[in-house]
């Protein structure tokens, strides 16, 4: 019987090999096809600030988004290090979810980022929709091979058949006394990977809206969540706490928002400038802008892949002066690539 199986397997492989050889050569135009599957979220929908909604800290905005999605979609899972019922996440970002949805849908994993990220390929292929968490951005490196080789390329290599539908949450940035192992900003490394969408919101409303959009997007999405904005404890970051949007609120990727607008008179006089930034940079820019009243606009990118080129170029033309602000090292960086595009 084993010999028969071996013979049948050999015949199957040979037939597939001969079929592949008979295929026409790839065309150059095919090189850029199937990098992303079409998304159903193409415009902002729902209420961003419903009447009577209470101000919500950023970490809770994400928690409520996932809670709503898991209640509505039995295929949704959440797993990662310490997100299970005993702790509920080191930032309380998964609190109560295991108790509400059970250990089968919310569970801990080994301390192995390659497994956490790589497992989403199989989960997605079977029809599940995993939220996974890498506990700190500094810990993403062991999972980069899976992110680059498997997750980002599945849709392309399968000729548009198998996108990896997953949301990867990554707390990021310097906060508290994290030291060299809990403070890194690594968005440049991830933005260099084609086939992944990337969000980096600065407010609770944006985090919830982008979290919902990421879930309904068939492509892999990485969401960077700045630890220093989770509770708005850092002076000047109170703006990250926003009224909780409605359950159906979604934001399309690639659409920036204006966080501060210069006065028309200073723009007309040629005395204005725009700061293009994201995440914690929004609040650094707001603080600095107080020294230049009426002269500064702030454009919050909200998503880094894709980023809103049209809005950035329009602001550059309007003001003639652009400062791109990032927490990362300046060179090489994603911010530097934005500068280059301008």
Residue ranges and their predicted role:
Residues 1-18, 22, 32-224, 228-230, ...:
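Thiamine diphosphate
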């Amino acid at each position: 019987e084993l010999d028969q199986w071996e013979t049948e397997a050999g015949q199957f492989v040979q037939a597939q090999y001969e079929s592949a050889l008979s295929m026409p050569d790839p065309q150059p135009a095919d090189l850029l096809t199937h990098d992303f599957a079409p998304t159903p979220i193409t415009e902002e929908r729902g209420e961003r600030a419903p009447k009577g909604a209470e101000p919500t800290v950023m970490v809770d905005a994400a928690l409520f988004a996932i809670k709503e999605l898991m209640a509505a979609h039995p295929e949704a899972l959440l797993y990662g290090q310490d997100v299970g019922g005993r702790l509920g996440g080191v930032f309380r970002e998964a609190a109560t979810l295991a108790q509400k949805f059970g250990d089968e849908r919310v569970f801990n994993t080994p301390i192995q980022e390659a497994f956490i990220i790589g497992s989403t390929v199989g989960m997605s292929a079977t029809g599940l929709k995993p939220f996974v968490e890498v506990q700190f951005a500094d810990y993403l490196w062991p999972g980069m091979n899976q992110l680059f080789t498997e997750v980002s390329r599945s849709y392309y290599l399968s000729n548009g058949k198998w996108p990896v539908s997953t949301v990867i949450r990554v707390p990021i940035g310097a906060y508290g006394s994290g030291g060299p192992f809990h403070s890194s900003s690594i968005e440049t490394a991830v933005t260099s990977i084609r086939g992944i969408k990337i969000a980096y919101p600065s407010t609770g409303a944006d985090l919830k809206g982008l979290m919902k959009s990421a879930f309904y997007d068939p492509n892999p999405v990485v969401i960077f969540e700045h630890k220093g904005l989770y509770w708005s404890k850092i002076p000047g970051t109170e703006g990250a706490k926003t009224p909780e949007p409605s359950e159906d609120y979604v934001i399309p990727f690639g659409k920036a928002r204006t966080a501060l607008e210069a006065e028309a008179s200073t723009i007309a006089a040629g005395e204005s400038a725009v700061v293009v930034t994201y995440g914690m940079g929004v609040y650094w820019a707001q603080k600095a802008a107080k020294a230049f009243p009426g002269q500064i606009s702030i454009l919050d990118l909200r998503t880094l892949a894709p980023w809103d080129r049209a809005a950035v170029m329009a602001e550059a033309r309007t003001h003639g002066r652009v400062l791109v602000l990032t927490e990362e090292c300046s060179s090489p960086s994603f911010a530097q690539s934005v500068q280059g595009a301008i």
